[in-house]
A protein has these predicted regions:
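Short, surface-exposed alpha-helical segments at coil->helix boundaries
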Residues: 66-70, 188, 224, 283, ...
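Residue-level signature of the cytosolic catalytic core of signaling kinases
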Residues: 85, 158, 175, 215-219, ...
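N-terminal Rossmann-like NAD(P)+-binding domain of SDR-like oxidoreductases, especially those catalyzing
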Residues: 2-210, 344-348
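Short, conserved glycine- and acidic-residue-centered signature motifs
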Residues: 127, 183, 219-220, 318
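Hydrophobic alpha-helix immediately C-terminal to the catalytic Tyr-X-X-X-Lys motif of short-chain
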Residues: 186, 190, 194, 226, ...
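C-terminal substrate-binding subdomain of Rossmann-fold SDR/epimerase-dehydratase oxidoreductases
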Residues: 4-8, 20-24, 44, 50, ...
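A short acidic, helix-capping loop that chelates divalent metal ions and anchors anionic groups
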Residues: 113-116, 212-213, 307-311
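Short aromatic-enriched loop/helix-cap "lid" or pocket-rim segments at secondary-structure transitions
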Residues: 60, 67-70, 97, 157-160, ...
Length: 365
């Protein structure tokens, strides 16, 4: 199948089975994952270890749970090739040699609507500075690298569904809400510049709403917030009129796509949407959570002005066009949203105490 790359060039690709690692080299890889103790990173670590790869994680635990690496170790005890280095990317990577690794996944970032709105300096500096450090690290040995980006890069959304080559429009710089989108767009520009100028095999993934076990709601993530409220019999707070619509994809489906993208030379220099394309409104999502968990919770509408700063801007619809990633790797998510809700509820029950301790401590160390 033929698709257009990020620079307009055609890319020849073939449909691939999403249940296996379609890497060019099936031998064990030495993998570095920044942000590997976080939500997506811990699931990716677990997947790669299960496939026999060596995994080194760099994470400062600012938003990741300390139990995540322990969970990975428990599952991957038969694969004693797992190392966790605590610290920021800018601190740790200068102490490591690129010669130690075969691939790099850069997942570390400032994430979550509330964190972005409340800490814009942290958001901008973390996203841009750390991505620059990681790209220089990978470029020193021309390591294949996957850069985690976001659907937020589409800004106000010129059209729906959103395609990787769409133009983007952001709000005024006086609203910090857009600093996350702009910082991740800069990350993309930088990664693509490394690819064009030095041949760095970099691939960019724009994650849409990714959900599932190990996700926390303290920084604005909607599904774990709804699930926790429903389990406690509390009101589910829906911001605005609730008609804003999103597409939710299970993290276990998402991480299966990442090794295939980084392992396919035809994907280098490309930008790929990653998620589901089935739309659900936030109000309908709240109702689905209540029904799935058999909760007696009510749904309460909350104006954006009460949830965030005045002038907060949100998109009516965020839906990915998945044509490119389907053509490149045959991506087809299989876990239904109802199953994700049930699994998240079960996992939230297990770790409720740790989340409370992290929030009380302010999240970051």
């Amino acid at each position: 199948m033929t698709d257009r790359g990020s620079d307009g060039a055609t890319v020849e690709s073939e449909d691939l089975d999403t249940n296996r690692d379609n890497s060019v080299d099936a031998s064990p890889q030495r993998v570095l994952i920044t942000g590997g103790a976080g939500f997506i990173g811990s699931h990716l670590s677990e997947l790669l270890l299960d496939r026999g790869h060596h995994v080194t994680v760099v994470d400062n635990f600012s938003t990741g749970l300390r139990s995540n690496p322990a969970r990975v170790r428990a599952v991957a005890t038969r694969h004693p090739r797992y190392e966790v280095i605590e610290g920021g990317v800018s601190e740790v990577l200068p102490t490591l040699s690129p010669e130690r690794f075969d691939r790099v996944y850069h997942l570390a970032a400032a994430v979550g609507v509330r964190l972005v709105v409340e800490k814009p300096i942290h958001t901008i500096e973390t996203n841009i500075e750390e991505t620059s450090v990681v790209l220089r690290f990978a470029a020193a040995r021309a390591l294949p690298i996957l850069i985690a980006s976001t659907s937020e890069v589409y800004g106000k959304g010129v059209r729906v569904p959103m395609r990787e080559d769409d133009d983007v429009v952001y709000g005024a710089t006086s609203y910090s809400r857009w600093c996350y989108a702009c910082s991740k767009a800069i990350d993309e520009y930088l990664a693509l510049a490394y690819h064009r100028e030095s041949g760095l095999p970099a691939v960019i993934v724009r994650f849409f709403n990714t959900v599932g076990p190990r996700q926390i709601g303290e920084y604005g993530m909607v599904l774990p917030r709804f699930v926790r409220a429903a389990m406690a019999g509390e009101d589910l707070e829906v911001h605005g009129d609730g008609r804003q619509s999103r597409c939710f994809c299970d993290v276990r489906d998402v991480v299966r796509a990442l090794p295939m993208l980084i392992g396919n030379p035809a994907c280098a220099g490309g930008v790929f949407n990653l998620g589901r394309d089935e739309i659900i409104s936030i109000k309908d999502l709240a109702e689905l959570v209540v029904a799935t968990l058999g909760s007696r919770s009510r749904i309460r509408m909350v104006p954006y002005e009460k949830a965030f700063a005045a002038g907060f801007d949100d998109l009516a619809v965020r839906q990915p066009d998945l044509t490119r990633i389907r053509g490149a790797i045959g991506f087809a998510p299989s876990i239904p949203l109802v199953q994700t809700i049930r699994d998240l509820a079960a996992e939230l029950t297990e770790r409720e105490g740790e989340v409370a301790d992290m929030v009380a401590a302010g999240g970051a160390r």
